[in-house]
From Swiss-Prot:
This is ATP synthase epsilon chain. Produces ATP from ADP in the presence of a proton gradient across the membrane. The lineage of its organism: Bacteria, Pseudomonadati, Pseudomonadota, Gammaproteobacteria, Pseudomonadales. F-type ATPases have 2 components, CF(1) - the catalytic core - and CF(0) - the membrane proton channel. CF(1) has five subunits: alpha(3), beta(3), gamma(1), delta(1), epsilon(1). CF(0) has three main subunits: a, b and c. GO terms for cellular component: plasma membrane; proton-transporting ATP synthase complex. It holds the Pfam family ATP-synt_DE. It is a peripheral membrane protein. It comes from the Bacteria. It comes from Pseudomonas putida (strain W619). Keywords: ATP synthesis, Cell inner membrane, Cell membrane, CF(1), Hydrogen ion transport, Ion transport, Membrane, Transport.
Amino acid sequence: MAMTVHCDIVSAEGEIFSGLVEMVVAHGNLGDLGIAPGHAPLITNLKPGPITLTKQGGAQEVYYISGGFLEVQPNMVKVLADTVQRATDLDEAQAQEALKAAENALSLKGADFDYGAAAARLAEAAAQLRTVQQMRKGK
């Protein structure tokens, strides 16, 4: 039997996942992080994007997070996220429309343009699309 670590994914709405996993892959500030049992302790920011859990037996679950924090301690991984959705609940067409709208907003800058908000909407829509694509790859 493969080694496991306990993983909790928590959002403002409550606990989304709690259980044993063989691996957690998340999108950190410096790239993707793979967390397996025995990983060194760590705390890091997470960017919007997919979180992939490899559960006991190799089954994978993919979630989308809009950002948050990852904490790794001996025998425990905790993800504290602003918003969490199961990848299967994401609407690819809606995410593509949001991506196009954000790209349009960035190209039509006016005097009252909020670049930070437009860039955040663009990053979130792109991360949702990346999550859907990653989920499809895993199937």
